[in-house]
Amino acid sequence: MAAAPLLLLLLLVPVPLLPLLAQGPGGALGNRHAVYWNSSNQHLRREGYTVQVNVNDYLDIYCPHYNSSGVGPGAGPGPGGGAEQYVLYMVSRNGYRTCNASQGFKRWECNRPHAPHSPIKFSEKFQRYSAFSLGYEFHAGHEYYYISTPTHNLHWKCLRMKVFVCCASTSHSGEKPVPTLPQFTMGPNVKINVLEDFEGENPQVPKLEKSISGTSPKREHLPLAVGIAFFLMTFLAS
């Protein structure tokens, strides 16, 4: 019975609005980018690997995963054997170059390599504003850095990745950025001229378009039309 009010509400919502409701408060659906975080991913083992995303995109990090035999798709045992387990950090640029986790904070922990059915996945949404107090906010035109440290085998190499959030609006150096105002929004320096400022000129005042379905009588002519109709009814009745 609890689903009945929700179903009734959905039936009352116009069909063109349903895609907008599905997009959520951000107003746009983002793409998803997948990265398999393990030592067999050669991209993560070299400096400079960059994933480019847009605002509202998602980055899905898949942790190392093994089946009961110790071998999993896309993630073989690391150097020295054993299941790979990592702690992922978001760090500064220098922390990325030196693979120093102390210059950042812990983001996720891949500590379940034998999870049933599928690997553990963490998702990062590159949103401009976060609705959560602990949520991270990202800015267009900036780079963000992720590294990992092994929790068991210290001989595993540093894995790292750089994420670039596209794209920042270009502006000349030294100039203050001009905010983009919504349509029909006036800035603080806009002067509004009243009719007295035109001194005899005939300002172009926008007119309302007539209804396509037909025209309606003017309000001031309505009493006259009612009087004529009443007179005709009285005359015909007599």
Curated annotation (Swiss-Prot):
Tissues in which the UniProt entry reports expression: Expressed in brain, skeletal muscle, spleen, thymus, prostate, testis, ovary, small intestine, and peripheral blood leukocytes.
Propeptide: 215-238
InterPro entries named in the record: Cupredoxin, Ephrin, Ephrin-A_Ecto, Ephrin_CS, Ephrin_RBD
Location of the protein in the cell: Cell membrane
UniProt signal peptide: 1-22
GO-annotated molecular function: ephrin receptor binding; transmembrane-ephrin receptor activity
Quaternary structure and partners: Interacts with EPHA8; activates EPHA8.
Recorded family membership: Belongs to the ephrin family.
Name under which the protein is recorded: Ephrin-A3
Organism per entry: Homo sapiens
